[in-house]
From Swiss-Prot:
Protein name from the UniProt record: Small ribosomal subunit protein uS2
HAMAP family in the record: Ribosomal_uS2_B
UniProt signal peptide: none
Keyword match Cell cycle: no
Disulfide bonds: none
PANTHER family the record matches: 30S RIBOSOMAL PROTEIN S2 PROKARYOTIC AND ORGANELLAR, SMALL RIBOSOMAL SUBUNIT PROTEIN US2M
Keywords: Ribonucleoprotein, Ribosomal protein
GO biological process terms, semicolon-separated: translation
Keyword ATP-binding: no
Organism lineage: Bacteria, Pseudomonadati, Pseudomonadota, Betaproteobacteria, Burkholderiales
SUPFAM superfamilies named among the record's database cross-references: Ribosomal protein S2
Length: 250
């Protein structure tokens, strides 16, 4: 579903941070200020959001993966829910250093998590109460840290981040590996190095929901379009195999 200017206004996307905390590199996206609060220019934010969503859709259409990241309190639940709805990996609790740059090691942890789940389903009766407690603690920690990426077998094709200041390590890792970045950037942070900037409030829960929902919708749409294209191609190929023969009466 396309995001509208009205929705952005109602979600408070235009409210930036206090003017004394601003980052001058965000000046092109600032409309002005009111009561010492910077006001973000939604006439610039909206098309940039649409461009970011279009990119996410294109990645999904070519069967790529968009990793959704939002570990700050007001983003956690929303990011997890929207990522699950879109069927993509996510990080909603904390970013582990090396999650991308040391993905080989992370995959070992993912295997451990999956093995433990299988073991749990089979039953833990063979373990002592102390061992069961230690098992439960390790499983809970792995689930919390990497549960959202347990089905991510390769590095993502793009990363969507809410609040660049809060996720500096994730952004640095993505840049190092050349993974395209889609990110919400508020007035107190620099947009440098972000491939698809969404200038906007990164603290409002309503705004966070709008961003995450918009990107998730784009991912779902892209995947749907890809399926439609495959179906059309199959139908066209099948049609070519049959040649109509007009019989003339003898």
């Amino acid at each position: 579903m396309a995001i509208t200017m009205r929705e952005m206004l109602e979600a408070g996307v235009h409210f930036g941070h206090q003017t004394r905390f601003w980052n001058p590199k965000m000046a092109p996206f600032i409309f002005g200020h009111r009561n010492k609060i910077h006001i973000i220019n939604l006439e610039k934010s909206l098309p940039m959001f649409q461009e970011a969503a279009k990119f996410a859709s294109q990645v999904s259409a070519r069967r790529g993966t968009v990793l959704m990241v939002g570990t700050k309190r007001q983003a956690r639940e929303t990011v997890a829910l929207e990522a699950q709805r879109a069927g993509v990996p996510y990080v909603d609790q904390r970013w582990l250093g090396g999650m991308l740059t040391n993905f080989k090691t992370v995959k070992t942890s993912i295997k451990r998590l999956k093995d433990m789940k299988i073991q749990q389903e089979a039953g833990l009766d063979s373990l002592s109460k102390k061992e069961q407690l230690m098992f439960a603690r390790e499983l809970a920690k792995l689930e919390r840290d990497i549960g959202g990426i347990q089905d991510m077998t390769v590095l993502p094709d793009a990363i969507f981040v809410i609040d660049v200041g809060f996720h500096k390590i994730a952004i640095a890792e993505a840049k190092k590996l050349g993974i395209p970045l889609i990110a919400v950037v508020d007035t107190n942070h620099s947009p440098e190095g972000i491939d698809y900037i969404i200038p906007g409030n990164d603290d409002s829960s309503k705004a966070v929901i709008l961003y995450a929902r918009g990107i998730a919708d784009a991912i779902i749409e892209g995947r749907s379009n890809a399926v439609d294209d495959v179906v059309k191609a199959v139908v066209a190929e099948s049609s070519d195999e049959f040649v109509e023969v007009n019989e003339t009466a003898a």
